[in-house]
């Protein structure tokens, strides 16, 4: 993919991670994203351009994983943030290691069942939109750590500038993003 697209996708994954930290309803958001992801798979498979594990699937997985980490850490924000950072770095490092091995001729499987985990396991599966767990979820988890650093006091970093403030278009698109 082109570099600008990669940058935008990286930023979006990072912001989803920040949103995980800020949100009070990650279980609900994750389930809702998973349902929409399954609907997208169903519709696109009928159209002949199947999306098997796209960005929305990955977001659903990442949000639910963050919810699980937060639950296991008993909603202790610092503990959750540190575990998320360590796991995020580990996911990216593992992907880097296995991707390097794959590029050097090592093949891990021909079983197409595990394609959603990582590029190095996709065994030739094609998808119209493809964001595997490794490394994508790692960036989301690291974003949640930065959510802790930036929003620990739960105060916006952006000023309110009146009723018709500069962020109104972003507020609107943020509210309807899942539907778009």
Please provide the spans of the model-predicted regions.
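Alpha-helical transmembrane segments and their immediate juxtamembrane cytosolic regions
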Residues: 1-180
């Amino acid at each position: 993919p082109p570099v600008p697209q990669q940058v935008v996708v990286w930023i979006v994954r990072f912001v989803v991670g920040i949103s995980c930290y800020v949100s009070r309803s990650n279980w609900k958001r994750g389930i809702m994203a998973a349902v929409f992801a399954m609907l997208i798979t169903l519709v696109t498979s009928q159209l002949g351009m199947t999306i098997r594990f796209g960005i929305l699937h990955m977001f659903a997985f990442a949000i639910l994983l963050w919810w699980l980490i937060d639950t296991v850490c008993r909603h202790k924000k610092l503990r959750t943030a540190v575990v998320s950072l360590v796991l995020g770095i580990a996911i990216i490092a593992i992907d880097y290691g296995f991707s390097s091995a794959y590029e050097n001729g090592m093949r891990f499987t021909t079983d197409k069942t595990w394609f959603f985990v990582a590029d190095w396991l996709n065994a030739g599966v094609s998808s119209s939109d493809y964001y595997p767990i490794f490394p994508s979820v790692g960036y989301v988890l690291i974003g949640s750590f930065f959510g802790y650093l930036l929003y620990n006091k739960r105060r916006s970093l952006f000023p309110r500038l009146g009723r018709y403030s500069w962020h109104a278009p972003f507020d609107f698109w943020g509210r309807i993003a899942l539907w778009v």
